[in-house]
Structures are given as structure tokens and as C-alpha cells.
Amino acid sequence: MITAFATQQTLDHLQLYSAFLNRESDASGTVVLHHGRVKRPGKQVPEFSTVELKPLVDDVDERLAAIARSAKDKHRLNQVLVVHRLGIIQACDSVLLAIVSGKTRDICFDACAWIVDEVKKEEFIQLIEH
């Protein structure tokens, strides 16, 4: 199963993780997650006041889903969830949640890292520090 979307709403990472686990079966031996948060100092503005996450395309949800599908196929995962914040957010706010499940930890760690690297290329969501 693949769940992927962008949202202006605050990420409820615990609810998303709980829902993910409720969809799991005994085919998964490992669940790995990445919970990305906005940190200081910033990359462009060390002491930024806000961060803007701006969509660069109209189909952000489909782009996230494509990354999730690629990870699922490439790493033979059982389930993938990718959720990305949009809009104006603060330091310490959650920006990205990626959760994967599969048979073994090595494929799950590799897949989760690959998803984060793909999203961080900023090809369809731009991060602007103010």
C-alpha cells in the first residue's frame, strides 16, 4: 500500500504512524521511519524566522506518490507512507514523514534514506528561509 500527500496542516506523526501500523501484516519484519523537522541554523539564513515550503508544480501529491511507488518497487517493500508539509512553518516543526515496511531492516533503511534523498532534491517543493 502507498500513501503519499502534501498538506498545509500540522503533521500528526503519531496518528499517521498508528494508522500505518494498523495496516501492517505479519509479512513485515521491519518498520523504519524518518521524521524530518526544521532545524537551525538554516542553510541560507542561519537565524531564519520562518520557513516557506512552496510547491513548484501542480501535482505535488502525484510526485510524492511516484517516489513512494519507486521505493516500493525498487526495494520490494510492503507499505510506504510519505507526507510533506507545505506553507509557512517554524523551527522544530515537522516537515517530512517517511515510513516504510518490509521483510528486512537493510532494505527498509535503504528505502527510507532513498525517499528522503529524493524529496530533498527540491525538484517540486522549494524550501525558502525567511
How does the language model describe each region?
Residues M1-S94, S101-H130:
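N-terminal, polar/charged subdomain of small-to-medium soluble alpha/beta proteins
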